[in-house]
Structures are given as structure tokens and as C-alpha cells.
């Protein structure tokens, strides 16, 4: 009877250690993913600082407050164009407005209510 209780206790202890190990592994993986995401975001922001004028960056920041998905799409497109060498001069506020309008027109969804 005593051996059985000790065996059960040993099984519980092993299971607890295994769960703790898995939890620590998941936590480390999550921290690594967050660190990678922060690094990518820092790289994106560095590129945007290079290619956007201060006024254009301010406009993009305001767009991000209202339409974060649109702002993110514009950021990624600008970074891709920069990396492909297609952006040769800084983008000012007027150019950014045109880019935003073009992307908005392509992604706009129309809702029609019929009576």
C-alpha cells in the first residue's frame, strides 16, 4: 500500500515537472517570437524614416490611429518598393496622399442596402 502511494506520488511529481518544462518552453518561444516581431517592426520604422518626410510620417501615424490595417498595408508596400529599389526620392505628404487614395480605392468595400 505504501509502495503504491509512493508510486502515485512519483508519477504526479514527474507529470508536474513535465508540465513545468513545457510551460517554460512555450514561454521562451513566445518571448523569442515577440523579440523577432519587435526587431522587424524596428527595421520597418527605420526604412520609413529614410523614405518619408516628417509630414508624411505624421500623416501615416494619424491614418494608423483611424485605419491601422490600411496604414500597415501602406507601410509594407513602401518597404517593398524601397527594397526593390523603386523608391529613389523621399515621399512627401502629397505623394503619400495619392498612395493612400490609390490603395483605398482598390480595397474599398461598397455596402448597398436595398429596400
UniProtKB/Swiss-Prot annotation:
Q: What Pfam families does the record tag this protein with? A: dsDNA_bind (PF01984)
The record's Gene Ontology cellular component field reads: cytosol
Assigned keywords, A-Z: DNA-binding
Keyword DNA-binding belongs to the record: yes
Question: Does Manganese show up as a keyword for this record?
Answer: no
Q: Which InterPro entries match?
A: DNA_bind_arc, PDCD5-like, PDCD5-like_sf
Q: Name one GO molecular function term.
A: DNA binding
HAMAP family in the record: dsDNA_bind
The protein's matches in PANTHER family, at most eight in alphabetical order, are given as: PROGRAMMED CELL DEATH PROTEIN 5
Q: Which family does it belong to?
A: Belongs to the PDCD5 family.
What name appears for this protein in its UniProt entry? DNA-binding protein PH1060
Lineage here is: Archaea, Methanobacteriati, Methanobacteriota, Thermococci, Thermococcales
Amino acid at each position: 500500500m505504501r509502495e503504491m502511494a509512493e508510486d502515485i506520488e512519483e508519477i504526479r511529481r514527474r507529470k508536474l515537472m513535465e508540465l513545468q518544462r513545457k510551460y517554460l518552453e512555450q514561454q521562451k518561444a513566445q518571448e523569442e517570437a515577440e523579440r523577432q516581431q519587435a526587431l522587424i517592426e524596428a527595421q520597418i520604422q527605420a526604412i520609413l524614416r529614410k523614405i518619408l518626410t516628417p509630414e508624411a510620417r505624421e500623416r501615416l501615424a494619424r491614418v494608423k490611429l483611424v485605419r491601422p490595417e490600411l496604414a500597415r498595408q501602406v507601410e509594407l508596400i513602401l518597404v517593398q518598393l524601397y527594397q526593390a529599389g523603386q523608391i529613389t526620392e523621399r515621399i512627401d505628404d502629397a505623394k503619400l496622399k495619392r498612395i493612400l487614395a490609390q490603395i483605398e480605392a482598390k480595397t474599398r468595400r461598397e455596402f448597398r442596402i436595398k429596400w
